[in-house]
Amino acid sequence: DEADMTSLKDDLKNYVDTLENDIKGRKLFYIKEVCDKELYKDSNDEVLMKVLDDFYKTLDKLREEGFIIEEISIDKNLLEAIYPSYMSISCAEATSNNANLTGIQFGPRPEGVDSYQELMMKARTEGFSELIKRRFILGSFILQKENQEKLFLNACRVRRLIVDKINDLFKTYDGMILPASGGIAPKFSDDSEKLSDRYLIL
């Protein structure tokens, strides 16, 4: 669609055919501060220990196939800044990019409203999940004039430091390998609704 800046015209490629079979000597790295079992020795999380055991077994198999795998260290402060930076930027962008979700052009159209302000409020109240509402509230807070420098712009600066560090590592290594998750999906009964656990970490 020539009128849609998000569409892309590209010939279909078979990316599997472009893979090189010769993997010997390819260099991968993993991050000590994420994978070192010693860091979790005081934890009673058996699932996490099993994940890490399986991860190190996978590394051994990859080494047998010819990969060179090295452990590298990254400043813990930088690693701990990844999630709050992501939340700050993504919530701010979600709030800004979805400002057009008013219930006027598209979306749920509530009945019995007397003004477009009431229409927007009802459409967003009824049409958004609790998670989306939380993200929009955080995004609005982050984008307030008095918070932009402290929260949003600082998060962008931290993102730049993270990207620069990873790009620098990729000058030496062909790829990064890490466990996909520190555990398994929680049961509904185990899920915590404490917002401070996930959101109020800025």
Regions flagged by a language model, labelled:
Residues 1-52, 117-122:
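A short helix-breaking turn/cap at a secondary-structure junction
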Residues 4-12, 26, 32, 72-87, ...:
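Flexible, acidic loop-helix segments that line cofactor/substrate-binding pockets
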Residues 35, 51-61, 65-73, 80-83, ...:
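Glycine-rich, small-residue loops and helix-cap segments
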